[in-house]
Amino acid sequence: EACRERAREWGLDVDRARDVVRSLLRDALAEPVDDPPSLADLADEHRAVDRLLAFRADTVETFVARLAAAAGSTTVNTYVLDPAAMAATGVRLADVEDHLDRVTAICYVDEPAAARERLRAVGERVALPVDAGISLDPDLVGSEADFRALVDAALDETDGEVSAYHHGLVTEAQLDWIERVLG
């Protein structure tokens, strides 16, 4: 209820937005299409969707600003998996950037070119240090050479930190890779 109250104070007609979104979803599920409209197109067509997305982004930005203020000298970082899809989650990097110290591009990929592209895409959207998070998921990284190639690609694209993720999946051999490649 607090969210609905804040939305009303913000000027968003929550019931209207809900009805529009339900109608759009009902239509999409009744007649699926190969190329659905983007959120940006839906926002252009439906003021209620535009207002809902703007409200969500404002809510996230307000939260991140409060978090940064409370953090004091502690580093504030956010993770970015797909920078092009961030707006759908309510995170507009341009809006929250002033409240962040760093951004981590999540590179859960198996190809060095994909890691480079992810880092480049994030770096183009922010004027902050961009770190790389590389997965050790065995379905993505099958050898030390694969891991080294991903780390090298990340280091080629950013001067930020490179971290290994999915420690719960790490084998003894992968611990050795981390030591040799990142150590």
What name fits each language-model region?
Residues 64-76, 120-130, 155, 179-182:
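Surface-exposed amphipathic alpha-helices with a cationic face
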Residues 60, 64, 115, 119, ...:
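Aromatic/hydrophobic pocket-lining residues that form the small-molecule binding cavity
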Residues 79, 129, 172:
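Glycan-recognition and catalytic regions of carbohydrate-active enzymes
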Residues 1-96:
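Polysaccharide-binding and catalytic clefts of secreted carbohydrate-active enzymes
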Residues 93-99, 119-128, 151-158:
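Acidic (Asp/Glu)-rich catalytic clusters
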Residues 100-116, 133-183:
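Substrate-binding cleft of secreted/luminal carbohydrate-active enzymes
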Residues 32-49, 123-147:
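Active-site clefts of carbohydrate-active enzymes
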